[in-house]
Amino acid sequence: MQQRRPIRRALLSVSDKAGIIEFAQALSQRGIELLSTGGTARLLADAGLPVTEVSDYTGFPEMMDGRVKTLHPKVHGGILGRRGQDDGIMAQHGIQPIDIVVVNLYPFAQTVARPDCSLEDAVENIDIGGPTMVRSAAKNHKDVAIVVKSSDYPAIITELDNNDGSLTYPTRFNLAIKAFEHTAAYDSMIANYFGTLVPPYHGDTEQPSGHFPRTLNLNYIKKQDMRYGENSHQQAAFYIEEDVKEASVATAQQLQGKALSYNNIADTDAALECVKEFSEPACVIVKHANPCGVAIGDSILAAYERAYQTDPTSAFGGIIAFNRELDAATASAIISRQFVEVIIAPTVSSDALALLAAKQNVRVLTCGQWQARSAGLDFKRVNGGLLVQERDLGMVTAADLRVVSKRQPTEQELRDALFCWKVAKFVKSNAIVYARDNMTIGIGAGQMSRVYSAKIAGIKAADEGLEVAGSAMASDAFFPFRDGIDAAAAVGITCVIQPGGSIRDDEVIAAADEHSIAMIFTDMRHFRH
């Protein structure tokens, strides 16, 4: 198989025009003939480039409002023709070989994301000719290059210059992989969209059936191969969504340290998503996907020091997340006090990074600033299937709360209750969080019995010499019995925030009244399994 193929003729037809003029200019300057369609051809002609309209080349006009432009044997024969094997039949029918195809597809995802998108709008943004050319060129990658991403334009020009106007087989093969990935993702988007519609009962109006299509097609891009997975005998890789806009562990930039492990990524995600809940300077320390210390303060240094106090033992080898820039003072406090696997923050100051450079094993990530969280889906793998649900973006404010006890919470208790409620959302069920003065005092996670989570939170606080009396307690789900309230009262909890909804709510409320505990219902549960 000949490794290089000279590029003499290009077909360009793009919806995303970014960089296309410059790329076409570079091709033309290297003696490559340009074929193009519709708006792309007009854009190139207006830029003064010598371009031949596909309709002039085929002798067949664009028709049906642009639905039929490139679906012609002279186009697909030029792409699919096997060099050295189909040359005779191509010459017989006046088919010129096309050596590189540059195509990206109608913006279907952006169209259906619009609130006012109709089914007709969606249908008209289903590209037919584009995917057909992409697949044709990718199939014939032995002879033809296919470019579907504008980010590849510079590398293409560089390789042409380095190879006397030719592209190598490895390049064409890698471009073909991208092309098939591109069309697979495109068809998946269309199938997922149509799968959320139910057929009309009257007239021609489709009705949405919710977020979940009949067949779920997922497309993720491999970001990283890993040494191993959750355990050393498991192979693993990290895949990310394409074009993620939200600040996340998937989009974070690593500034130093070893490659992130499977467990690093899972724990960093838990820490970052928790710290996003707070508008004040906040710090979250996570171990094994559970917060072991959370606090807010006047600065991130104060927040870190208070979060660390909750459970210094568990913080060893943990993940630390901030919602403000990591400064030198905080970086110094961390590395002088504890071993840490990962630190993630929106940004890191140059002074902080210089200090951390002395600890090259510490992985330092920046994720950028974040806005409101975007809606999306969560997945949980089960044997033979996939559980799919909306992300848990539920939150409450003081206005949403119901006080069900005889005693009203004080202003301080209310603040503490809202604080530990935010934390409880990120603790594995059964989850109990004790907090006071915007700092976790004790956290009980992952117990099969809720009362034991409450007891563990109290034990944690006692082990660190933290005063529980006067603290608030959050529970991620309702109390099925009064025993959890009795356990909380025994260590001095004075306010409890929980969803409510148990058939024994009256019994639980009576226990709170018996202990003069203020009890708040959120009417929202935050199970986390």
Curated annotation (Swiss-Prot):
Annotated domain remarks: The IMP cyclohydrolase activity resides in the N-terminal region.
GO molecular function terms listed in the Swiss-Prot or TrEMBL record: IMP cyclohydrolase activity; phosphoribosylaminoimidazolecarboxamide formyltransferase activity
Top-rank taxon, per record: Bacteria
GO BP terms: 'de novo' IMP biosynthetic process
PANTHER family, alphabetized: BIFUNCTIONAL PURINE BIOSYNTHESIS PROTEIN ATIC (PTHR11692:SF0), BIFUNCTIONAL PURINE BIOSYNTHESIS PROTEIN PURH (PTHR11692)
Pathway(s) it belongs to: Purine metabolism; IMP biosynthesis via de novo pathway; 5-formamido-1-(5-phospho-D-ribosyl)imidazole-4-carboxamide from 5-amino-1-(5-phospho-D-ribosyl)imidazole-4-carboxamide (10-formyl THF route): step 1/1; Purine metabolism; IMP biosynthesis via de novo pathway; IMP from 5-formamido-1-(5-phospho-D-ribosyl)imidazole-4-carboxamide: step 1/1
Catalytic activity, reaction form: (6R)-10-formyltetrahydrofolate + 5-amino-1-(5-phospho-beta-D-ribosyl)imidazole-4-carboxamide = 5-formamido-1-(5-phospho-D-ribosyl)imidazole-4-carboxamide + (6S)-5,6,7,8-tetrahydrofolate; IMP + H2O = 5-formamido-1-(5-phospho-D-ribosyl)imidazole-4-carboxamide
Protein's recorded name: Bifunctional purine biosynthesis protein PurH
EC number assigned by the record: 2.1.2.3, 3.5.4.10
Sequence ranges assigned to domain MGS-like in this UniProt record: 1-148
Keywords from the UniProt entry: Hydrolase, Multifunctional enzyme, Purine biosynthesis, Transferase
Entry GO CC: cytosol
Stated family: Belongs to the PurH family.
InterPro entries: AICAR_Tfase_dup_dom_sf, Cytidine_deaminase-like, MGS-like_dom, MGS-like_dom_sf, PurH-like
